[in-house]
């Protein structure tokens, strides 16, 4: 991989790896190699959840568990991580197999989000918990400053359902219209039919649940509630 691209990524992350192989593994999708990033992703997911939970606990001393859980879910969900990955220009650094390259995997939200988590796991193993906590809080500084408790933190499906129920309208229906990929790396496409919208809304995700949430989020935008 181009060392200029890798060095640019490390500058954006604010961290230079001592163990180059950990960085390469974090950037490697399972379609490209048997030494892929899924174990690092597992580790990074847990570390991210802890760091954000700890930050919210101290930032909002009077907020209850439910609101803190919703705020954490907002901050660690896939589209937030994918947004962060795009800020790092992570797509140009991914190591993908031929099939994923051909299908535009370097733009896919689920792959981008998973790679951010893998990088978190890799940085932790390359350094220590204090270093990765400092980095995560730096990456999340503006998002932590902007977030606040309240209904906005409820997941999109819940907000869409409550909106429709409040107007005595039928609940949305979700239909799986396509499933792509192997069992370990699937992509679901969902059509969501909502009263008041003339055509089904489309959502895509790495699981049925994530695709339904993505569709509900698009529906909220079309209903001008986002």
From Swiss-Prot:
Cofactor annotation: Mg(2+)
Entry's localization field: Cytoplasm
Reaction equation(s) it catalyzes: Endonucleolytic cleavage to 5'-phosphomonoester
Pfam families: dsrm (PF00035), Ribonucleas_3_3 (PF14622)
Gene Ontology biological-process entries: mRNA processing; regulation of gene expression; rRNA processing; tRNA processing
A Gene Ontology molecular function term of the record: rRNA binding
The keyword RNA-binding appears for this protein: yes
Domain DRBM: 155-225
InterPro entries for this protein: dsRBD_dom (IPR014720), RNase_III (IPR011907), RNase_III_dom (IPR000999), RNase_III_sf (IPR036389)
Protein EC: 3.1.26.3
Keyword set includes Nuclease: yes
Domain RNase III: 6-128
NCBIfam families: RNaseIII
Protein name as it appears in the record: Ribonuclease 3
Organism taxonomic ancestry: Bacteria, Pseudomonadati, Pseudomonadota, Gammaproteobacteria, Enterobacterales
Gene that specifies this protein: rnc
């Amino acid at each position: 991989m181009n060392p200029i691209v890798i060095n640019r990524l490390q500058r954006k992350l604010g961290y230079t790896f001592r163990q180059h192989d950990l960085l390469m593994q974090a950037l490697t999708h399972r379609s490209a190699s048997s030494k892929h990033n899924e174990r690092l992703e597992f580790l990074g997911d847990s570390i991210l959840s802890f760091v954000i939970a700890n930050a919210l606990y101290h930032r909002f001393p009077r907020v209850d568990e439910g609101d803190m859980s919703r705020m954490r879910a907002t901050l660690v969900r896939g589209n937030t991580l994918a947004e962060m990955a795009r800020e790092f220009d992570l797509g140009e650094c991914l190591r993908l197999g031929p099939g994923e390259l051909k299908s535009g995997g370097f733009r896919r939200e689920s792959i981008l989000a998973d790679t951010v988590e893998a990088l978190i796991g890799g940085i932790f193993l390359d350094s220590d918990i204090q270093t990765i906590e400092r980095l995560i809080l730096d990456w999340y500084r503006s998002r932590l400053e902007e977030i606040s408790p309240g209904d906005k933190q409820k997941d999109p499906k819940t907000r869409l359902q409550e909106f429709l129920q409040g107007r005595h309208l039928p609940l949305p229906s979700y239909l799986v219209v396509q499933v792509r990929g192997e069992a370990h790396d699937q992509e679901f496409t969902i059509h969501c039919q909502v009263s008041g919208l003339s055509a089904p809304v489309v959502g895509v995700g790495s699981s049925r649940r994530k695709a339904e949430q993505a569709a509900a989020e698009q529906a909220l935008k079309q209903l001008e509630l986002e």
